[in-house]
Amino acid sequence: MDTFKVQLQEFFSAGDGADDAPCLDAPNLLEHQKRGIEWMRRRERRGRPHGGVLADDMGLGKTLSVMRLIANDGDDAHKTLIVCPLSLLNHWTAEAKKHNLPLNLRQFHGGDLDESFDDAKAVAITYDTLRAHHKHYKTAGRASGLLARHWHRVVLDEAHVIKNHQTGVHAAACALSADNRWCITGTPIHNRHWDMYAIIHFLRCRPFDNVGVWRMLNRNNDTNRIKSVVNKIVLKRNKAEIALDIPQHDVQDVHVRFDEAEARVYNELKSASQRAYDDAVASADKAGGMQDVLWLLCRLRQVCCHPALTKCAAMFPEHAHIFEPAYESSKCRRALELVQRVLDTPDDKVVLVSQWVEFLQLVAGLLRRRGVPILLYTGQLRVEERTAVENQFNAADSPYRVLLMSIKCGGVGLNLTGGNHIIMLEPHWNPQIELQAQDRIHRMGQKKRTYVYKMIVDEENSIERYMKARQDKKLTFVNKVFDRTALNYEDIKKFFSL
């Protein structure tokens, strides 16, 4: 208990007071970026742990802030290791060159860190490369390469990748040795407080990196106690409070109603889902039964978009026509109306987002039949092809004013400020992923007012209506956690009866 009390006191008392570091040499930065870098430097010198979470809204220049932090290291400092998704690896290199920063940033794809990396101030790798090294380490029984080196700083970009603390990628990140540990993500919490625990465990944020302490802290889902920890180690600013010159951002729900045939198909699949659920509850093989339920729930979501996605045409021969790819479902018709409205406004562009590539391809076919030139941005594209699509869409003189994007590809590192409208074709279980996609257009560099249209089938028993309610509940929880009013050290001591 004495150790626990000491760790608790150190956590809440460290990091306060003036910084004795020399003035920051960071030209061409915005004021919020300068303040952010000073906060990071202060945490590296005085914080417990040494590091934290930079969680500014997407599009506020977190990457450049971190690179400026690295650039201001002394020449005698050890290297910084940057871990990021594959889609962002070239982005880090390009940004360093664009801003002429003396990082000599090198990409590492495996093997050993030989002498060719000696002059690099920063090394960038992917999460997959890190995980592979850790897997080899566990097999060989000894550290090598990345894991054998002690780093001055480790930076996890899009750190929510490690949000499950029971995964291999989380274990690999935690195995890295470093003086300073940083998580960069606009969305530290996606669904639940355990997402935050995974980050705290990586940061070695004692005593809260102990799973038992964290579980007790979150007893009864009391967000006040979580906030007391989060506020100490997280810097999170949104676009509104920074008052950047980013035009207004409007979000609206677009309600869709089924036609008669779609309603019939939906209701029959809904009844089948209910029967499958009842059978699963009564079955000895609950896990297998619940897989059937989840499959049917996915079909319900797909019916809301286009019946053809369900592959259930044989069940409804009397409504075979609505399962044809050329059929304009109720949601497709409404989406096409929104697209046409954008195209009727000179120079405006629109991004359509879905989690199903097949649905994007259906919508693309409907648009092509109307003579609309379109671009597709999905995981099927190579990295260089993605860059080409991004540049084509953003170009002022481009004939392409409509881009269809997989939500999985639209979450990280993508700048689509050439567009100013975005249509979310269906709700996602994780609202943070939706927000990431929306911020592809609403970010620094945007010159126009932006519009988000969230399409929802608003029938009484619609799964999309249920998902919308779940999203609102999750966002309320996240907003409470990052609210800056929180318990203090004395409050936390009382809770743990110290």
Swiss-Prot record:
GO terms for molecular function: ATP binding; ATP-dependent activity, acting on DNA; helicase activity; hydrolase activity. ATP binds at residues 55-63. Keywords: ATP-binding, Helicase, Hydrolase, Nucleotide-binding. A motif (DEAH box) lies at residues 157-160. It holds the Pfam family SNF2-rel_dom. The keyword tRNA-binding does not apply. One of its GO terms (biological process) is DNA repair. Residues 337-493 form the Helicase C-terminal domain. Its EC number is 3.6.4.-. Residues 43-206 form the Helicase ATP-binding domain. SMART domains: DEXDc (SM00487), HELICc (SM00490). InterPro entries: Helicase_ATP-bd (IPR014001), Helicase_C-like (IPR001650), P-loop_NTPase (IPR027417), SNF2-like_sf (IPR038718), SNF2/RAD54-like_C (IPR049730), SNF2_N (IPR000330), SNF2_RAD54_helicase_TF (IPR050628). Belongs to the SNF2/RAD54 helicase family. This is Probable global transactivator. It comes from Orgyia pseudotsugata multicapsid polyhedrosis virus (OpMNPV).
